[in-house]
Every structure is written in C-alpha cells, then in structure tokens.
Amino acid sequence: VALCDIKQEWAEGGKDKIAKGYARLVAKEKMTQEKVDGILASITPGLKEDLCKDCDLIVEAAFEDMQVKKTTFAELDKIAKPECIFASNTSSLSITEIGNGLTRPLIGMHFFNPADRMKLVEVIAGVNTPVETVDAIKKISEEIGKTPVQVNEAAGFVVNRILVPMINEAAFIKMEGVSDIAGIDAAMKLGANHPMGPLELGDFIGLDICLAIMDVLYNETGDSKYRACPLLRL
C-alpha cells in the first residue's frame, strides 16, 4: 500500500499516526503486535510521483475543494498506468465534475471517520463511470470488510446530506441561545439515543469540513434550508 502526500514528511507522519492507533489496540489486547507489524510493513509512505506508477487503485483524500481534487487527479492521470482505477473520497462534491477531463473514469469511494471502525462505504458513480468500475469498487469494499452502498450522484450523497444539516441546525440553536453546547449535545444523546452530540460530532468531523459540505449543498440546490450557520464561518 502506498501512502502519499505532497511532502515526504507528511506521508511519514500519516504512517506514524496509523502506528499510534494500532499501538492503542495492542495495549487493549484487541490486536497482536505481530499482526500490527505485518500491516505497517505493507505501508510505504512517499510522494505520488514515486509510488503511484504501478498502483491498481488510487483513492484520493485531498481537502474538500473542487480545484484541489481536479488538480490532484490531473497529475495522477499522467503518472498512473491506464488500467488503474481512480476513486475519490469526496464527502459531497460531484464525481462527474471532478473527473471531467481525465483519460479514465472516476468513481466515488467515500469512507467514514474513523475509517478503520466505520463499516460503510458510499459508492458513487459519475455520468461516465462504467458498471464494471462500480462492481470492482463494491467487491474491493467487501474484501476489506466494508459494506458498500451505491448512491446516485447528488450533493452530499446520503449520509452527509442528512447528518451535516443536523450539525448545522445545532449550531443555529446555539447561536439563537436556545441552549448551550453541553445542553444541546446532552439532549440529543439522551433524547435521540445518539452516541455523540451534534456539536461534539461537528468538532470530530471538523467544522471546516462541515462548512464546506453545507456550502456545496446550498450552492448545488439553491435551497435556503442548507444555508450555513454563521458560527461555522468563525
């Protein structure tokens, strides 16, 4: 497995973060050190120019910005072998637009945080994504222990179109003084049986990501119900 970033030290830092996560599992006796060593040995951190030439599947997880993703794939398109499958981990952006101009089809392969524990993968086909690519990504998802759910291309797909507006509404409730952060989170945990309150979840996801998703939903639909709470812009 190639783990790539725009700087070598960032890629190595990514592997270090993975190693720390596995160390916690070993400490809790949920995984053996031998298995962890084998997993870490299979991960090579580096730059895409050096490591992506022979990949069979590339999953992009760049910042949730259309131009950043388009530029990343345009660069990869010059490096990767023709049969390599391109997949984006975008949480809300158009697969068709991201893939426009590439010499190969693109597919959405949206994992959920934390990816090592969350079972779902949203599989999103763009206008030019062939059935064979969809089937291949579903099969790969199952092989790595995930449950693939195919969704049609639409802003936010399924989970984030439901989840992030809830977080946004919680921010409005805080802004309007209906309750404080602790009260809002406690109400949803105890009253709706959510494992995590919406504002705590927003922090976990990243408020910048929540804002980016709300902006995509609003810009794509023009529906005022997706207007981002001003608190998310602070």
Summary of predicted features, one role per range:
Residues 1-5:
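Short beta-strand "acidic-cap" motif of Rossmann-like dinucleotide-binding folds
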